[in-house]
Curated annotation (Swiss-Prot):
This is Trigger factor. The keyword Chaperone applies. Residues 163-248 form the PPIase FKBP-type domain. Its main location: cytoplasm. One of its GO terms (biological process) is 'de novo' cotranslational protein folding. Belongs to the FKBP-type PPIase family. Tig subfamily. It is an enzyme of class 5 (isomerase). It comes from the Bacteria. It comes from Geobacillus sp. (strain WCH70). Signal peptide: none annotated. GO terms for cellular component: cytoplasm. NCBIfam families: tig.
């Protein structure tokens, strides 16, 4: 097999690959064995048609596509390895020659990983985040816990206020017609949560239980349902019930409800302080690591291919969908409640996606420049930690992980950032 790599402008190039005729014939043989299983010709049992009869009846060309499906993946992978390139996208393949008894010639236009010209990455000046825990921090955490332990109590009299939960029926109309997803009964809506279309919740304020009202709103221009985007809508709303939050008293009993390891409110405050101190310390360390990485990435010169940004945006979208599903939601519901569509969300994610790609390429280049590698001992230590965290035997964890490349890459990533932090100038 012969391989030629021609670099084009930017991060693109063309592989020209020639596969030996002998290998092509092997591919045709394999293709025939696959295809003939489903062939029935009078005088022969299904799957037992001789090759010569098959080719006479259908032509050898009938085998070409299946032969290509067999030959191309292996030939392309070998060509990439021989050329020493790192494609970042699916290649665009064109067949130049495919004929029985002759070599296979194809071209593959590919986008490759860009060259990284590192700027300054040692001696970077960064500030360490203040990790002091104040009395106010402790009080704020106490208030948050108080909110979490609040009870929703029905208001016997009174009107809807911000922070209340209103149990409502609603039905929406656009141009006088009801629309899909615009109707619900006994829906619990927290006023001020921003869950509904802008202006909807505000107009519930002041309503009483049993009261009915028509609410006028306008769907956002970027609303996910194009047929509703930018259109005025009328919602008929009925309030069934109003619930208000009743906060528990901040006393020793509350402290024991929150944490059965404490007896008094003061003990709870001490425990909160220690937890916040640990949290702030970790946040400060994470912020420091992020800062050195961000500066090193900013100093690097990289012509990032658009396809890498798109692929990272795809990954971010999948991660976001997974987080929504953990909350019992999905992307479709998110689009409905937020007024966004996929295109708007992708555009919103694009800048972060590009930063992620830039950082990953920079870290990889620094690791290479500084010969940062991961030892077997380090991998085994990491596996021990992971096994302990998941309450598994190391061998079982290895079996579940299969390939340990991900563990190795994660360790190399962390070691490279450790190197950047150790070689930075940290100001308090």
């Amino acid at each position: 097999m012969s391989v030629k790599w021609e670099k084009l402008e930017g991060n693109e190039g063309v592989l020209t690959v020639e596969v030996d005729a002998e290998k092509v014939n092997e591919g045709l043989d394999a293709a025939f064995k696959k295809v003939v299983k489903n062939i029935a010709i009078p005088g022969f049992r299904k799957g037992k048609v001789p090759r010569v009869i098959f080719e006479k009846r259908f032509g050898v060309e009938a085998l070409y596509q299946d032969a290509l499906d067999i030959l191309l993946p292996e030939a392309y992978a070998k060509a990439v390895e021989e050329a020493g390139i790192e494609p970042v996208d699916v290649p665009k393949i064109d067949i130049e020659q495919m004929e029985k008894g002759k070599s296979l010639i194809f071209t593959a236009k590919v986008t490759v990983k860009p060259e990284v010209k590192l700027g300054q990455y040692k001696g970077l000046e960064v500030e360490k985040m203040d990790d002091t825990v104040t009395d106010e921090d402790v009080e704020n955490e106490l208030k948050r816990l108080q909110e979490n332990y609040a009870e929703l109590v029905v208001k016997e009299d009174g009107k809807v206020e911000n922070g209340d939960t209103a149990v409502i029926d609603f039905e929406g109309f656009v141009d006088g017609e009801p629309f899909e997803g615009g109707k619900a009964e006994n829906y619990s809506l927290e006023i001020g949560s921003g869950t509904f279309i802008p202006g909807f919740e505000d107009q519930l304020i002041g309503m009483q239980a049993g009261e009915e009202k028509e609410i006028e709103v306008t769907f956002p221009e970027e609303y996910h349902a194009k047929e509703l985007a930018g259109k005025p809508a009328t919602f008929k709303v009925k309030v069934h019930e109003i619930k208000e939050k009743r906060l528990p008293a901040l006393d020793d009993e509350f402290a024991k409800d929150v944490d059965d390891e404490v007896e008094t409110l003061e003990q709870l405050k001490d425990k909160i302080r220690k937890r916040l101190e640990e949290m702030k310390k970790n946040e400060a360390e994470a912020a420091l690591r992020d800062a050195v990485v961000e500066k090193a990435a900013e100093n690097a010169e990289i012509d990032i291919p658009e396809v890498m940004v798109k692929n990272e945006t795809d990954r971010m979208l999948r991660e976001f969908d997974q987080r929504l599903q953990m909350q019992g939601l999905n992307l479709e519901l998110y689009y409905q409640f937020s007024g966004q569509d996929e295109a708007a969300l992708r555009e919103q994610m694009k800048e972060d996606a590009e930063k992620r790609v830039r950082v990953a390429l920079t870290i990889e280049a620094i690791a290479k420049a500084e010969n940062i590698e991961v030892t077997e001992e380090e991998i085994n230590e990491e596996l021990e930690k992971m096994a302990k965290a998941y309450n598994l035997e190391v061998e079982k964890l290895k079996e579940l992980l299969g390939n340990l490349d991900g563990v190795k890459e994660d360790l190399k990533w962390r070691k490279t950032i450790d190197f950047l932090v150790e070689n930075s100038k940290v100001a308090a």
